A protein has these predicted regions:
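N-terminal lobe of the biotin/lipoate ligase/transferase fold
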Residues: 1-103
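Generic non-transmembrane alpha-helical segments
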Residues: 61-65, 69, 116-124, 224-232
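Contiguous, small/hydrophobic- and glycine-enriched helical/loop subdomains that border
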Residues: 89-134
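Long, positively charged amphipathic alpha-helical accessory segments at protein N-termini or as interdomain linkers
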Residues: 124-126, 157, 161, 165-236
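Short amphipathic alpha-helical segments
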Residues: 17, 21, 58, 105-116, ...
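Short, conserved charged micro-motifs
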Residues: 58-61, 101-106, 180-186, 217-218
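Short secondary-structure junctions
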Residues: 7-9, 73, 126-131, 234-236
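Beta-rich nucleic-acid/ligand-interaction surfaces
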Residues: 130-151, 155-159
């Protein structure tokens, strides 16, 4: 199959539009129209992304509380926990075919993504470590951290491909210039109204701009992320 790769970048979009585009691209990879896609995006409106389901019910009370605080609410059919999206957080989705004949290995898929992101941070002179981050929102074993503080959260889904095989959706949320105390507020509010007692703390998170003197533009950071993916591809 001839490689058909695609790069899509949105510097200021809405969560709804980003996820609609992601779903469209997943279908194109599943049907072999594309070999792989890198989707990079940042929102223009503060939005709390909520996993759909009984654990996280969307109530009028929750919607009103978020709206009063200046946050939109978006519910989508995924696992995990609430994730805040604001300008100053870069998101990436890497959609690709898992190698044929190789059993899907979730640990390898996560570590591949973490390796690419490690290259991205190395380009900026920043050292990161991969581990869980207690008291962070949507905590996971494959967070990237600077000095024990979370800077990236990751997620993974595997989907079936037309004609057999598997497609991987690898996702990451990268804190660039977000106010960590403000972004945890809607998560705490959601936990409280949905009956969860998770202790979410702002100070266990850290944005990139606290660790570098330059302030690269979103376009520049998108380019460096793309470069990290290309560098990783050459070493495969």
């Amino acid at each position: 199959m001839v490689a058909k790769n695609k790069l899509i970048r949105f510097t200021a979009t809405e969560v709804t539009d980003a996820f609609e585009k992601e779903d469209e691209l997943i279908k194109q990879v599943q049907s072999n129209q594309l070999s792989q896609v890198l989707l990079l995006w940042q929102v223009k409106s503060p939005t709390l992304v909520l996993p759909a389901g009984k654990k996280w019910p969307v109530s009028n009370e929750l919607e009103h509380a978020l709206n009063t605080s200046g946050w939109k609410l978006f519910s989508r059919k995924t696992g995990g926990a609430p994730v805040p999206q604001v300008p100053g957080i870069i998101n990436l989705s890497h959609i690709y075919h898992w190698p044929e004949g190789e059993p899907y290995n979730i640990k390898k898929a996560y570590l591949d993504l973490c390796a690419i992101l490690t290259v991205f941070f190395e380009q900026l002179g920043v050292k990161v470590d991969v581990h869980a981050t207690p008291y962070s929102y949507c905590d996971g074993e494959y967070n990237l951290n600077i000095g024990g503080q979370k800077i990236v959260g990751t997620a993974q889904r595997v989907l079936l491909k037309k004609g057999g095989g598997q497609v991987v959706l690898s996702q990451a949320c990268i804190l660039i210039d977000a106010d960590v105390e403000k972004i945890v507020e809607p998560v705490r509010m959601c936990n409280q109204l949905c009956g969860h007692d998770d202790d979410i703390r702002g100070d266990v998170h850290t944005p990139l701009f606290h660790h570098i003197s330059d302030r690269p533009s979103v376009d520049s950071l998108f380019q460096q992320l793309t470069s990290a993916f290309l560098t990783h591809a050459k070493t495969e």
